[in-house]
């Protein structure tokens, strides 16, 4: 019987396939974090799901927290793409804020697994949870900074709205938190209660946005 190649025996991909292996690891980690919870999931369980040895995982991630942060930043990165489209196509400051909320809601409902992982429960490592959206954004490549980058874009939109002459009831960061809390509540409820007989999802999203905007404007 021919001997297994070193790459197969070690669980390594051939040269040039490392990115594929990294994505396989992240997919396995995401599935297990959702199925068993972040705290209960072990490196060995992730390695078994991928079909490699535990040491092979350390070629890509130094620990479980690094995997979770990569999943968070991957998710936020996709959301940021939608926000960037808004910034490039919507000129009215108030409409930008509305579009932000709409894009956020649609993203969450289109990607319920990712949303549950990142926003619902206690999956986020404590090192990031402590600072949350107030993490410094001077280095956009810092692991776990994705959420803060998304929040900063909303703060910027609200600052632009204020600069256009619209008066806000509260400081911009407080208004941003209120907007996020409102739309997050709608999205989280719909994701966690998919069987609930919601009246009309589109109206609920629009209605919450109307309530939020009336609340933050003077």
Region roles according to the model:
Residues 1-20, 31:
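N-terminal intrinsically disordered/low-complexity leader segments
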Residues 24, 28, 32-66, 70:
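Helix-turn-helix
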Residues 32, 86, 107, 157, ...:
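Short alpha-helical functional segments enriched in proximate histidine and acidic residues
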Residues 70, 84-114, 146, 172, ...:
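Hydrophobic alpha-helical connector segments
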Residues 71-99, 129-132, 137-139, 154:
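Amphipathic alpha-helical linker/stalk segments
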Residues 115-116, 130-131, 136-144, 151, ...:
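Hydrophobic/aromatic-rich alpha-helical bundle segments in the mid-to-C-terminal region
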């Amino acid at each position: 019987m021919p001997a297994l190649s070193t790459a197969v025996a070690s669980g390594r991909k051939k040269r040039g396939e490392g990115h594929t292996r990294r994505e396989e690891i992240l997919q396995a980690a995401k599935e297990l974090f959702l199925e068993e919870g972040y705290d209960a999931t072990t490196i060995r369980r992730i390695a078994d799901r991928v079909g490699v040895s535990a040491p092979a995982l350390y070629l890509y991630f130094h620990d479980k927290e690094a995997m979770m942060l990569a999943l968070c930043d991957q998710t936020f990165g996709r959301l940021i793409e939608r926000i960037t489209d808004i910034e490039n196509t919507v000129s009215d400051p108030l409409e930008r804020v509305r579009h932000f909320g709409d894009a956020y809601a649609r993203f969450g409902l289109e990607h319920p697994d990712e949303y549950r992982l990142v926003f619902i429960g206690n999956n986020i490592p404590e090192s990031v949870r402590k600072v949350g959206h107030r993490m410094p954004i001077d280095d956009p490549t810092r692991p776990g900074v994705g959420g803060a980058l998304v929040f900063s874009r909303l703060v910027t939109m609200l600052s632009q709205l204020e600069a256009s002459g619209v008066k806000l009831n509260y400081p911009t960061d407080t208004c941003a938190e209120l907007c996020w809390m409102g739309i997050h509540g709608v999205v989280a409820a719909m994701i966690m209660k998919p069987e609930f007989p919601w009246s009309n999802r589109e109206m609920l999203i629009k209605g919450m946005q109307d309530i939020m905007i009336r609340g933050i404007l003077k």
